[in-house]
A protein has these predicted regions:
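Short, extreme N-terminal leader segments that mark the start of a protein/domain
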Residues: 1-20, 285
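Short, conserved active-site entrance elements at the starts or edges of catalytic domains
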Residues: 159, 163-211
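Short, glycine/charge-rich beta-strand/loop segments that flank catalytic centers
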Residues: 87-104, 114-118
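Short secondary-structure junctions
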Residues: 3, 24-27, 44, 106-113, ...
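Short catalytic-loop micro-motif centered on adjacent basic/acidic residues
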Residues: 89-91, 154, 257-260
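Conserved donor-binding loop and adjoining core beta-sheet/short helix segment
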Residues: 16, 22, 26-97, 207-234
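Acyltransferase donor/substrate-recognition loop-hinge adjacent to the catalytic core
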Residues: 106-177
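Aromatic (often tryptophan-rich) hydrophobic motifs at membrane interfaces
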Residues: 201-290
Length: 290
């Protein structure tokens, strides 16, 4: 089968290969891969039990993702064989998989993707928010509770989609998005809402006095809850903190980690993610093989 453009109809074929990843990076999840498939012109192929996927970087070059299957080293070597031009480029290679690429023949150049390390948190800490280091988060939640007369958090299902879409459109009118990753994310949020069952994500809706003030979408894979989408109305102080805690309480109970993904170099986002005290950051690397 030749490489083909990635679509949401491919989720049932591609998703089972994520079990071969031994790290908790968000790139090998349904939301992490399929929400960005169009922006990065992603294509895929399965050959001899190995999933190969490619993307076009913002520099215009073709990159391979980490091949997924029973024999990842053989998949990496196959990328070199099928791509005789040099260098052969790989992206978002998890730090734990670097020994595999270092073993490839040729000169291997490795560069850290500093803005794309995932923030990994303790699931228990995200639920409890106990101790001095989380006092700021608890204060934000207390402010949210003082702002509204009543509140609720409930699972997001198909019956909520129309109301969530209305909230999302209203929220976006307050923001001035320019073309790029933020605009693409918003486009894909709409797609996920319209194809909730195909994506198979879990979600939650936060209400204040009956009105939606935030929603989240994510997925559970192995021991980790991945938070792909988190949107809240900042006119309700503390809504983001309340939304995060309730979502983790609903879906991360009994898990080990919560992955809140990367900061993409956004300094405000970086501060917000660091303020939640991650247990570690999962580094990723670009690799060129000459």
């Amino acid at each position: 089968m030749p490489f083909q453009k990635m679509t949401i109809d491919d989720i049932p074929v591609i998703a089972p290969y994520f079990r071969f990843v031994t790290t908790n990076t968000c790139d090998f999840t349904v939301g992490g891969m399929f929400m960005w498939r169009d922006y990065f012109h992603m294509a895929w192929q399965v050959k001899d039990g190995v999933l190969y996927s490619t993307l076009t970087g913002e520099d215009g070059n073709l990159y391979y993702n980490l091949p997924l299957g029973e024999d990842i080293p053989a998949g990496l070597r196959q990328c070199l064989t099928r791509h005789p031009e040099r260098p052969v480029r790989f992206c978002t290679i998890p730090e734990a998989e670097l020994p595999l690429v270092r073993a490839l023949p040729g000169r291997v150049e490795i560069t850290e993707e500093e803005n794309f390390a995932d923030y990994l948190y303790s699931a228990e800490e995200m639920i409890r928010l106990s101790g001095k280091k989380f006092s700021g988060q608890r204060n934000h939640i207390s402010r949210f509770l003082r702002t509204c007369r009543s509140w609720s958090f409930e699972p997001l299902n198909n019956t909520d989609v129309a109301e969530v879409e209305t909230f999302f459109h209203t929220l976006n009118k307050k923001l001035n998005y320019t073309p790029g990753e933020a605009a693409e994310e918003n486009h894909k949020v709409q797609e996920v809402l319209e194809h909730l069952d195909q994506y198979g994500l879990v979600g939650g809706v936060l209400r204040a006095d009956g009105a939606i003030v935030g929603f989240t979408l994510g997925e559970v894979l192995r021991d980790t809850l991945y938070i792909h989408i988190e949107k809240a109305d900042r006119d309700y102080p503390g809504a983001y903190q309340m939304l995060c805690r309730q979502f983790c309480t609903a879906y991360a109970d009994g898990l080990t980690y919560v992955n809140r993904e990367e900061d993409m170099g956004d300094l405000g986002l970086r501060k917000a993610k660091r303020d939640l005290h991650p247990v570690t950051q999962l580094k990723k690397y670009t690799v060129e093989v000459w």
